[in-house]
Regions:
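Nucleotide-activated donor-binding/catalytic signature segment of Leloir-type glycosyltransferases, i.e.
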Residues: 89-113, 121
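Aromatic "clamp/platform" in nucleotide-sugar-dependent glycosyltransferases that forms part
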Residues: 127
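Short hydrophobic beta-strand element within catalytic cores of glycosyltransferases
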Residues: 144-148
């Protein structure tokens, strides 16, 4: 018997295995977040800025795709933006040396919760996901999400959540969507509420 996390994942397996696929269904998971650490202490410890786009996960080129280039080109198009790019997670590739890009490496779970809470925008640039726990964790904390629309699972979350996450498919759409989020507090708040409702309705252990 096969359990899938999302419809997109199920469709991909059907496409590959066709009539030979074992019995299957979609099984949702629940989200459990640790209590947040003290923000002032965490911010000082990792030298975190006040405004940042956040990535949480394995820090390697295979997961990040073109997001370094896209982000730095965004800063060239919108030089007045104070947004920085913070990456949380173990590094598996050489760091990108730039003053607007900050690495924390591994953090404790309580620190991770606090860092997500204080992010302006949370991003998942991965091309391959079966669910994306960071997306669900960020939505549970009412954060606006920006995701890679070339990943069917992430794109499905955007549609099913009534656009609690926005997706991009190339550099231009990345820059356009990021500017929308960076420049509109109301949009971020609206998306945060949608995401919170989406997670509570679909990914609650209760």
């Amino acid at each position: 018997y096969i359990s899938f996390n999302t419809t997109a994942e199920q469709k991909l397996a059907r496409k590959i295995f066709g009539m030979h696929m074992a019995p299957h269904s979609i099984v949702s998971v629940g989200i459990e977040l640790s209590a947040p650490s003290d923000w002032a202490v965490t911010q000082e410890k990792y030298n975190l800025p006040d405004e940042y786009m956040l990535y949480v996960g394995r820090v390697d080129q295979g997961k990040l795709n073109n997001v370094y280039t896209y982000f730095l080109n965004y800063k060239k198009v919108y030089p007045n933006s104070d947004l920085k790019f913070v990456l949380v997670g173990k590094q598996y590739s050489d760091p990108f040396n730039h003053p607007d890009i900050i690495y924390t490496n591994f953090v404790e779970e309580q620190e991770k919760t606090s860092i997500i809470q204080h992010a302006k925008i949370v991003i998942n640039p991965s091309l391959y996901e079966s669910l994306s726990l960071i997306l669900l964790e960020a939505m549970a904390l009412k954060k606006a999400m920006l995701v890679n629309g070339n990943c069917n699972v992430l794109k499905e979350h955007c549609h099913k959540s009534n656009n609690a996450a926005l997706y991009y498919t190339n550099e231009k759409s990345f820059i356009d969507k990021l500017h929308m989020l960076d420049s509109s507090t109301n949009l971020r708040l609206e998306m945060g509420e949608k995401g919170y409702s989406y997670v509570n309705s679909n990914y609650d252990w209760n």
